[in-house]
């Protein structure tokens, strides 16, 4: 995409009250999200610290995986990164550049049985251009969170329009729109921190934000501010969650043909190489016997290696990528695991969303029974605050937070989830480079999160190469831990 040279001022009131009302959360426990006429939202709350957007530009990077990553019944062998740069300015004339990057992850964000990989990726690129233009044309001053809240309905409208224009067999889903918009949102947060010379995580209190959390999350949050649910200084260390894809080799004997690129090629080798203590296990969800044998096999090999290394504590998370037909499948699986390997069962820390992402359509898939055994976290369905409330109603006890859903939405959901005492974890979307720095930064600043997933190092290490010397504590993992103490640079910290 090209940089925009000339822009027109948006027409007064171009976002109607009807559009805003359609964007309101469904739950009566949540307040409407900035349901005010656009010409009053910022006029009534404009502050000297607010930013105006001068420019937004985008470009792409393409990478091939060193080995395929299988999840949700599909194998992924490539990735496209969307990089976003912005220029912002304060009323006093100060300016700053911001940067955001995210893998487009169309197989996960826009799964389709009817459209090809290239077609869904093309739709996301078309949407990215519209989101870039919408954001670049926005002229009101504000905090990045308020700008995102105000523009999200426009992004969703653009997704619908592109779906019609491209005559897509399926409409671009909201999750896909969030992923596509996430590097734009990140760039604004990055620029906002830089223009004030502080970490972005020090800009979420009353000194920089016009509203308390009740404005976004409802009356239960009256008088509370976002920074009360965040750490202004990062944790010093985080455990690394290593993904074990459904087609990954467990033993060296499983390797069909060596890659010979100097990196590990089996789980046994990876545990030794990085000193891993946290494993995310991808399962099928539609083959109980296979899932059970896979789990038992991984647990046996992990136990053997950890005993050799003298490691006594490690944990697993389980991810069925929505493929379980019902909660009975999950409960049966957990009981069988407990029978076959009681010690392995005790190592299970949490379970990611096991059934279909459309919660409204599948209200029968409640998680109450499974959640009695282990925390069950909402993931693919978690696209808004009302989805969080519905997930709680259906028995989910945790929330998966992801930078790929946007810095603004993720921080607000993290606050709400903490209020409701939900289990929290931070996962990635095979995020390399700056997107991983962003993701790790989230995990390092959210209370209660002790680990972060980072699997680009396994599947697309070439995209990490330029970043290894700049952030060795993140990209060169030792003893299963990342060093995160220096994630307090201005902005989001990835690019100066």
Language-model segments: which ranges?
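Active-site mouth loops of central-metabolism enzymes
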Residues: 241-264
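Catalytic core of soluble alpha/beta enzymes
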Residues: 281-430, 435-436
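Short, Gly/Pro- and small/polar-rich lid/capping loops
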Residues: 44-85
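N-terminal secretory signal peptides and thylakoid transit peptides that target proteins
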Residues: 5-28
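Flexible C-terminal active-site loop/helix
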Residues: 429-496
């Amino acid at each position: 995409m090209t940089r925009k040279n000339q822009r027109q001022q948006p027409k007064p009131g171009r976002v109607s009250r009807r559009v805003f009302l359609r964007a309101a959360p469904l739950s009566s426990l949540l307040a409407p999200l900035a349901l005010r006429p656009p010409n009053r939202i910022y006029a009534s709350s404009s502050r000297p610290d607010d930013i105006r957007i001068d420019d937004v530009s985008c470009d792409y990077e393409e990478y091939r995986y060193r080995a395929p990553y299988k999840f949700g019944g599909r194998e992924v062998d490539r990735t496209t990164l969307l990089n976003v740069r912005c220029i912002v300015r304060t009323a006093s004339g100060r300016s700053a550049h911001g940067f955001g990057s995210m893998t487009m992850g169309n197989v996960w964000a826009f799964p389709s049985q009817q459209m090809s990989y290239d077609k869904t990726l093309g739709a996301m690129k078309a949407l990215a251009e519209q989101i870039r233009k919408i954001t670049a044309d926005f002229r009101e001053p504000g905090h990045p969170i308020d700008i995102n809240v105000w523009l999200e309905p426009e992004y969703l409208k653009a997704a619908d329009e592109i779906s019609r224009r491209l005559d897509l067999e399926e409409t671009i889903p909201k999750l896909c729109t969030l992923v596509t918009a996430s590097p734009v949102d990140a760039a604004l947060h990055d620029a906002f921190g830089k223009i004030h010379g502080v970490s972005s995580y020090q800009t979420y209190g009353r000194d920089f934000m016009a509203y308390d959390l009740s404005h976004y999350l409802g009356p239960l949050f009256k008088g509370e501010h976002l920074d009360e649910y965040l750490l202004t200084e990062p944790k010093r260390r985080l455990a690394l969650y290593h993904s074990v894809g459904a087609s990954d080799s467990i033993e060296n004997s499983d390797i069909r043909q060596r890659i010979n690129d100097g990196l590990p090629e089996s789980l046994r080798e990876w545990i030794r190489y990085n000193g891993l203590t946290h494993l995310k296990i991808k399962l099928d969800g539609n083959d109980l016997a296979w899932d059970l044998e896979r789990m038992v096999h991984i647990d046996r090999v992990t136990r053997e290696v950890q005993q050799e290394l003298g490691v006594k504590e490690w944990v697993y998370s389980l991810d069925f990528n929505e493929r379980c037909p019902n909660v009975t499948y999950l409960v049966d699986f957990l009981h069988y695991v407990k029978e076959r390997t009681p010690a392995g069962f005790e190592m299970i820390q949490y379970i990611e969303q096991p059934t279909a992402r459309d919660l409204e359509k599948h209200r029968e898939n409640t998680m109450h029974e499974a959640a009695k055994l282990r925390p069950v976290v909402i993931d693919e369905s978690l696209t808004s605050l009302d989805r969080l409330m519905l997930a709680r109603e259906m028995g989910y006890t945790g929330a998966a937070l992801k930078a790929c859903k946007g810095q603004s939405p993720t921080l607000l959901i993290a606050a709400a989830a903490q209020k409701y005492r939900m289990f929290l974890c931070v996962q990635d979307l095979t995020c390399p480079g700056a997107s991983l720095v962003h993701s790790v930064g989230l995990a390092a600043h959210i209370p209660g999160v002790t680990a972060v997933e980072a699997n680009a190092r396994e599947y697309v290490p070439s995209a990490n190469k330029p970043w290894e010397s700049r952030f060795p504590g993140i990209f060169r993992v030792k003893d299963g831990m990342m060093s995160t103490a220096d994630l307090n640079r201005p902005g989001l910290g990835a690019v100066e």
